C-alpha cells in the first residue's frame, strides 16, 4: 500500500515506536519523552528486562556483568560516563581527573601473571616485549585509514606479515622463539575478544583505524552497569516500555488505519509476534545487527532497499562470551588483576582449523580477577569466535570440568580445588541478539555503518522518517560500545525533534 506522502493530522502529536529497550532505545525514548512534541511514545522490548546487552546479574554474593563490562574511555567526551556521573553511579577514583586523562590507546593492560600450557610461568618481561611489538603493529594499522589501497585486506594478515619479518631477525634459541610466537597468539585471541570476531583475518584493514578511542582508564560500575539503564528507565513515564513484546514485521510506506484511531492514517504499522499491531508515524529500530541479519527477509514489509540490506549482510557481527568461575579460596596473588593463558604449541603464523570439540578452551584469553565480594573470589574468562559459540552448546558441568583441568594444567598444580560454580554468557544463542557486537569486516567499510544508519524512505517519496535506525552498529567511529549505542539513539531522536519540535502547536511535520 503506497504512503499518502504525509503523516496526516496526527492529533496531539506523532505516534513514535522504539523497537528494542537497550541503551540506544532507552536513550532515544528519554530524549523524546522530555519534549512536549512527543506525548505518544512506546518502547517495544522483546524480553522481560530492559538494558539489552547491558546485563548485570546478582550472583556469587555480588553483581557480575554478563554483558557490557567497562565504560571504554571514561572522560568528558563519553556520554555514558557523563550520564553515569550525573546519576551518581561512579566512585571517586573513576571520576578523578587523573583517571580521565589516562591514554590507553584502547589497549588492554599487561597481565599480572602468564601461565603456559606446560605448567610453567612465562617471564613477564618476555610478555611485555611481545605486547610492545603487537600493540605497536596495531597502532601502525592507522596508517592505512585514508590510503587508496592496502597491502592486504585484513588486520590479521597485516599483523602476521609484519610479525613474520620480525621473527626473521630474532636471535634466540628455538624454544624461546616458539614461546614468543605463542604469547603473540594469545594477544591475537585477546584482540578477537576486543573486536568481537572469530579471527582478525575477518577484520578489514583500511577502516580499522576509524574506530575512535577516548581518553580515560576503562572503569566499571561497582553496583552494576544495569544501574545506568535502570536510571534511564525510571526517567521515562510509567508504562512507556512494553515488555515481552517481540516484533515480527514492520509494515511501512503504507496508509494504515486502526479502529482505535478513527479518521487517522499511519505510514507504519508494527506487527508483533502475538498478533498485536501498533500504528506509528515513526519507528526507531534499535535491535542488534545479529538479530536484524537473521530476520532480514521477514522483519520489513516491503523489504529494505537492496543497498541497505547488503550493508547489513557485510558488516561484521561476532561473539565474545564470559565465563565466571567462583572459588572458595583464591589460588592467585592478592594484587593479581589479569591472568594470561599461553598455549605453547600455537603460533599466529600457522593457520589451524578450530578444533571445537577437543580444544575450544584454547581460545580462552585468560581471566580477569573480579574485585572480591564478601568472602567470595571470582575469575571472569573471555572467549571469542566459533569456539565461544561452541562453548554455549555445552553444559555448565562440562565447562566447569574442562576449565578445572585447564587451570590445573597451567598452574602445574593437579590438586588445585575445582571452582564451586560457573556462570556464563550465551550471546550467540540469545534469540534477540545472536552475537555480541559489530566490527567492520573485510568487504565492508565505515560507509556501510553510515548506510545502515540512514532513515527510510531514502528517496523522499512518502512520509518522512518512517523508519529510523540506531544501535552500536550504526555508529561509524564508536561501533561495539555502549557510548556508540547511546549516541546513536540520541542522533535518531534528534532527527525527529528537528522535524517536529517547531510544530508543537501545529503538529504537522515539514514535508
Curated annotation (Swiss-Prot):
Sorted alphabetically, which keywords does the UniProt record give?
A: Acetylation, Cytoplasm, FAD, Flavoprotein, Oxidoreductase, Peroxisome
Give yes or no: UniProt keyword Oxidoreductase.
yes
Q: Where in the cell is it found?
A: Peroxisome; Cytoplasm
Task: Please give the tissue specificity annotation from the record for this chain.
Answer: Widely expressed. Not detected in spleen. Expressed at lower level in neoplastic tissues.
EC category name: oxidoreductase
Name any one GO molecular function: N(1)-acetylpolyamine oxidase (3-acetamidopropanal-forming) activity
Which is a GO BP term held by this UniProt record? spermidine catabolic process
* Cofactor remark: Binds 1 FAD per subunit.
Which pathway? Amine and polyamine metabolism; spermine metabolism
Induction of expression: By polyamine analogs.
This entry carries the following GO cellular component terms, namely: cytoplasm; cytosol; peroxisomal matrix
Q: Which residues carry this modification: N-acetylmethionine?
A: 1
Q: Show the InterPro entries listed in the entry.
A: Amino_oxidase, FAD/NAD-bd_sf, Flavin_monoamine_oxidase
UniProt EC number: 1.5.3.13
- Positions bound to FAD: 24, 45, 53, 69-70, 247, 472, 481-482
Q: Where does substrate bind?
A: 72, 194, 320
Reported cofactor(s): FAD
Motif Microbody targeting signal positions after renumbering to this chain: 509-511
Domain of life, per lineage = Eukaryota
Please write the reaction equations for the catalytic activity of this protein: N(1)-acetylspermine + O2 + H2O = 3-acetamidopropanal + spermidine + H2O2; N(1)-acetylspermidine + O2 + H2O = 3-acetamidopropanal + putrescine + H2O2; N(1),N(12)-diacetylspermine + O2 + H2O = 3-acetamidopropanal + N(1)-acetylspermidine + H2O2
Note the Pfam families from the entry.
Amino_oxidase
Q: What does this protein do?
A: Flavoenzyme which catalyzes the oxidation of N(1)-acetylspermine to spermidine and is thus involved in the polyamine back-conversion. Can also oxidize N(1)-acetylspermidine to putrescine. Substrate specificity: N(1)-acetylspermine = N(1)-acetylspermidine > N(1),N(12)-diacylspermine >> spermine. Does not oxidize spermidine. Plays an important role in the regulation of polyamine intracellular concentration and has the potential to act as a determinant of cellular sensitivity to the antitumor polyamine analogs.
Q: Which family does it belong to?
A: Belongs to the flavin monoamine oxidase family.
Q: What else is known?
A: Oxidizes N(1)-acetylated polyamines on the exo-side of their N(4)-amino groups. Plant PAO oxidizes spermine on the endo-side of the N(4)-nitrogen.
The UniProt subunit note reads as follows:
Monomer.
Put simply, this protein is called: Peroxisomal N(1)-acetyl-spermine/spermidine oxidase
Species name: Homo sapiens
Amino acid at each position: 500500500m503506497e504512503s499518502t506522502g504525509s503523516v496526516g493530522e496526527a492529533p496531539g502529536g506523532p505516534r513514535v515506536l522504539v523497537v528494542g529497550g537497550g541503551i540506544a532505545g532507552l536513550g532515544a525514548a528519554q530524549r523524546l519523552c522530555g519534549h512536549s512534541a512527543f506525548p505518544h511514545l512506546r518502547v517495544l522490548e522483546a524480553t522481560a528486562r530492559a538494558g539489552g546487552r547491558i546485563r548485570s546479574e546478582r550472583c556469587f554474593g555480588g553483581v557480575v556483568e554478563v554483558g557490557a563490562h567497562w565504560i571504554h574511555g571514561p572522560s568528558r567526551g563519553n556520554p555514558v560516563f557523563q550520564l553515569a556521573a550525573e546519576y551518581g553511579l561512579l566512585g571517586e577514583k573513576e571520576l578523578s581527573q587523573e583517571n580521565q586523562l589516562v591514554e590507553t590507546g584502547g589497549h588492554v593492560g599487561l597481565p599480572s601473571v602468564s601461565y603456559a600450557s606446560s605448567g610453567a610461568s612465562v617471564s613477564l618481561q618476555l610478555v611485555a616485549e611481545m605486547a610492545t611489538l603487537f600493540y605497536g603493529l596495531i597502532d601502525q594499522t592507522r596508517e592505512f585509514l585514508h590510503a587508496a589501497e592496502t597491502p592486504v585486506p585484513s588486520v590479521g594478515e597485516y599483523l602476521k606479515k609484519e610479525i613474520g619479518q620480525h621473527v626473521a631477525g630474532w636471535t634466540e634459541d628455538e624454544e624461546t622463539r616458539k614461546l614468543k610466537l605463542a604469547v603473540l597468539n594469545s594477544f591475537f585471541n585477546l584482540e578477537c575478544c576486543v573486536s568481537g570476531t572469530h579471527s582478525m583475518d575477518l577484520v578489514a584493514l583500511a577502516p580499522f583505524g576509524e574506530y575512535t578511542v577516548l581518553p580515560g582508564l576503562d572503569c566499571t560500575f561497582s553496583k552494576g552497569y544495569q544501574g545506568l539503564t535502570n536510571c534511564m528507565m525510571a526517567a521515562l513515564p510509567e508504562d512507556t516500555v512494553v515488555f515481552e513484546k517481540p516484533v515480527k514485521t514492520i509494515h511501512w510506506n503504507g496508509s494504515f488505519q486502526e479502529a482505535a484511531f478513527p479518521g487517522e492514517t499511519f505510514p507504519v504499522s508494527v506487527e508483533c509476534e502475538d498478533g498485536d499491531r501498533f500504528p506509528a508515524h515513526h519507528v526507531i529500530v534499535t535491535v542488534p545487527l545479529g538479530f536484524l541479519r537473521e530476520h532480514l527477509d521477514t522483519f520489513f514489509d516491503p523489504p529494505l532497499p537492496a543497498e541497505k540490506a547488503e550493508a547489513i549482510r557485510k558488516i561484521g557481527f561476532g561473539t565474545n562470551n564470559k565465563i565466571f568461575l567462583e572459588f572458595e579460596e583464591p589460588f592467585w596473588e592478592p594484587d593479581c588483576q589479569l591472568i594470561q593463558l599461553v598455549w605453547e604449541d600455537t603460533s599466529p603464523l600457522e593457520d589451524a582449523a578450530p578444533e571445537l570439540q577437543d580444544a575450544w578452551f584454547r581460545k580462552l584469553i585468560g581471566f580477569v580477577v573480579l574485585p572480591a565480594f564478601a568472602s567470595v573470589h571470582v575469575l571472569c574468562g573471555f572467549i571469542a569466535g566459533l569456539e565461544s559459540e561452541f562453548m554455549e552448546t555445552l553444559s555448565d558441568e562440562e565447562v566447569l570440568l574442562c576449565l578445572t583441568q585447564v587451570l590445573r594444567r597451567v598452574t602445574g598444580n593437579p590438586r588445585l580445588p575445582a571452582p564451586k560454580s560457573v556462570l556464563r554468557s550465551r550471546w550467540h544463542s540469545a534469540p534477540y541478539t545472536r552475537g555480541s557486537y559489530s566490527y567492520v569486516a573485510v568487504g565492508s567499510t565505515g560507509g556501510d555503518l553510515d548506510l545502515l544508519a540512514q532513515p527510510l524512505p531514502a528517496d523522499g517519496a512518502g512520509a518522512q522518517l518512517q523508519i529510523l535506525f540506531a544501535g552500536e552498529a550504526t555508529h561509524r567511529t564508536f561501533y561495539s560500545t555502549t557510548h556508540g549505542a547511546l549516541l546513536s539513539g540520541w542522533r535518531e531522536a534528534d532527527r525527529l525533534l528537528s522535524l517536529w519540535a517547531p510544530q508543537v502547536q501545529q503538529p504537522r511535520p515539514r514535508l
